[in-house]
């Protein structure tokens, strides 16, 4: 009971330490610094900066959070708020470089190495904050989060994002790399501030005490903050879904910009700042003749805390040790054994209560094989497609890993080719870097090559070609224009080693190549290349575009195209509508029906200008159906639930509905709330997720036949959809993923995400609420209705983040991506291979 009281007290304490308007972000900044260091390659003369930072993690981690230390009112009654503000901007970095060069010439002693490591942590914080808060730039993380989830209210999105980012970090990541000691170079900081201000502006006591408060806050976050996941998941689906991957201010992007500022800082430490352009905003610093014409503007961060820490200080004690130039903070352990034991015991009890000690026969928990990578953060399986690439009559697998990095080359991305045979894909575990049949690699810094893939005969020479999306090309220039590369195939079954066709976009933030599709758009029976760019301006902000290039024999082996010259194009209706987030093509009466999802679309047509913001439903979502080359949509399907995001996923096929073979379209609304009943009690499952099934006919708009729903809060049931005939009966099975599903019903208070994928037999589909007609006393019941339930072999792996099937001689194999798996390396991703049914 005492442990429970302490946990409750910690949650209350964090509410005081990080109230509304607080900067916070301690866990987030430490995670960014950790990722930036992973692939840093920075040797300057005799100094290997990666080794230096690894040696002095105590200083590096403390520095990555230090700029926010004087914001809280609990810190000396807030009188040094402006000192924190100044620590976020270029003049502080300039003063630090001058101070180090003047006082500590090479070779550096250990204290100076720690000072440099601390400074590198500060610079990571600087550039991360610019992108996260949209300081002097547009469409950074929090600005977009405000537009999507908070009726465009940045003041509401700001505290939810700052503190919510820490909640999400602690819920999703393991901080086993966290140093038990932090070092703050207090004496040197006094000197740097004197250099910056020309006078004494802060005391050593304030530096030590306020930094120590951050150390305490980190301790509190490690113990309890993850238990607030349900609260912040409800506040912002965007935060949960885009926290790592969002192109401008997501974790991956902030880590990329951290490595950039590290190179600039090392240059200045060696050469001084005379050959550098030093605008106020650190994101736009250039050195050595580089040019950057966009300097942005300085925008104040701001933030306040309330005054409560006594309970926490009493519990962990004050472990502070002074040295000649600095101070060490230490903790015996970042977790309390009693709390850890309590969490695990409760998790086991709840798990047994809800799922029992044995699994139903329909549950499949072990894949036939797993394909992995040995490098972290690769996002293996982010995009997948299947086709007979080598023309041997068997299905092959194409899989993207857009987060793939080398030392010094972060997020260049890769695409892997795995060939099948008469038995299907290899049914042994594979390290794809060593055993894939083919590898293509991106060549642009942080271009995220492999974010989308499609196979088609683009040059109409009779052999398949491969199109690859790299939507973050241009990131180093802050343009994020993106690119699509087409690699021609050959009659020998090999792909070109370099792209034959490059398609570019001129618009800033175009993110060209976010989604790709092969579909016959012009009616010549040859698949064409369809490109979705949901973040593209489209004449506004993130309206999104869908563009098609017709296949033809006129393309040369070194073709340069621009998306503005596409053969067919449509644009989103509203700002932040994200048209093209999902794409799907289906043949209806010998015509291609092209479907485009716009999951963050909202209906503003019936509201006057003055009342649009607060009265509109956020992100009900919409799907557009086109019969190209006509650009006017033939039909639209609109969501009716706020935050439902209808159109996030799309798929089609043929199933038996009440005994009649029917062509159907499935549309996912993975963040739609679901009504659940437990006996006579009714509750709302926030973001449980729903999937609609429509009948497709040649002469009329799609008509709703059935719905499927998830049975856990936040599970995002329907986030990924796929239809494929798994048993050769001429009917497609319906495959529905719930990648964020949590086994227990507390939705994050106990346990982790474990993800599930449901396979519904195509012969047994009924009209109406399929998962609501249950034998048990709990509804919905997707597990009761599914023929198979694939269980994640690893907690927290986002099992079901992508799904595809590959045809072998006898039956299809099901490939499930777990994009956050750490099977091969931390958060690298994995592919699980399943062969369902009796062999």
Curated annotation (Swiss-Prot):
E.C. no: 3.1.4.50
Catalysis: reaction(s): a 6-(alpha-D-glucosaminyl)-1-(1,2-diacyl-sn-glycero-3-phospho)-1D-myo-inositol + H2O = 6-(alpha-D-glucosaminyl)-1D-myo-inositol + a 1,2-diacyl-sn-glycero-3-phosphate + H(+)
Secretion signal, residue range per the UniProt entry: 1-23
InterPro entries, A to Z: FG-GAP (IPR013517), Gprt_PLipase_D (IPR001028), Int_alpha_beta-p (IPR013519), Integrin_alpha_N (IPR028994), PLPC/GPLD1 (IPR029002)
Compartmental location: Secreted
GO cellular component: cytoplasm; extracellular matrix; extracellular space; high-density lipoprotein particle; intracellular membrane-bounded organelle
Presence of the UniProt keyword Hydrolase in the record: yes
Catalytic EC class: hydrolase
Record PTM: Glycosylated.
Extent of the FG-GAP repeats: 365-427, 434-496, 498-558, 562-622, 632-692, 703-769, 787-839
Cystine pairs: none
Glycosylation sites per record: 94, 271, 292, 307, 321, 500, 590, 658
Keywords, ordered alphabetically: Glycoprotein, HDL, Hydrolase, Lipid metabolism, Repeat, Secreted, Signal
Gene3D superfamilies per the UniProt record, alphabetical: Integrin alpha, N-terminal
Task of the protein: This protein hydrolyzes the inositol phosphate linkage in proteins anchored by phosphatidylinositol glycans (GPI-anchor) thus releasing these proteins from the membrane.
Family: Belongs to the GPLD1 family.
Annotated protein name in UniProt: Phosphatidylinositol-glycan-specific phospholipase D
